[in-house]
Amino acid sequence: MYTTEEKARIRWACRRGMLELDVVVMPFFEECFDKLSEQEQRDFVSLLECDDPDLFTWVMGHGRSENLGHASMVDKIVAHNLSKVR
């Protein structure tokens, strides 16, 4: 479990250098983070340490992370955002 202060830091890390990532990562954090398992939360936090170009490539489906935790988390982020447009 993350403390309120740690979650505030994670929320800040969701703010990316690319607007395209902001609109998919931040809503996922706000709406789903607390529902994730502890391992999934760790994977999400680890994913935020990745470079924006890599994260953008994965979210857009033009590549896939070799890190299985990251790949799984990207799948969850994409699925969450797709569910909002259907």
UniProtKB/Swiss-Prot annotation:
The answer to whether keyword DNA damage applies is no
Location of this chain's protein in the cell: Cytoplasm
Q: Does the keyword ATP-binding apply?
A: no
Predominant place of localization: cytoplasm
- Pfam assignment, any one: Sdh5
InterPro entries reported for this sequence: SDH, SDH_sf, SdhE_FAD_assembly_factor
- Assigned GO CC terms: cytoplasm
Gene3D superfamilies per record: Flavinator of succinate dehydrogenase
Q: Which UniProt keywords apply?
A: Chaperone, Cytoplasm
Q: Name one GO biological process term.
A: succinate metabolic process
Q: Which family does it belong to?
A: Belongs to the SdhE FAD assembly factor family.
Relate the protein's function as given in its record.
Answer: An FAD assembly protein, which accelerates covalent attachment of the cofactor into other proteins. Plays an essential role in the assembly of succinate dehydrogenase (SDH, respiratory complex II), an enzyme complex that is a component of both the tricarboxylic acid cycle and the electron transport chain, and which couples the oxidation of succinate to fumarate with the reduction of ubiquinone (coenzyme Q) to ubiquinol. Required for flavinylation (covalent attachment of FAD) of the flavoprotein subunit SdhA of SDH and other flavinylated proteins as well.
Q: What's this protein's name? A: FAD assembly factor SdhE
Question: Which source organism does the UniProt entry give?
Answer: Vibrio vulnificus (strain YJ016)
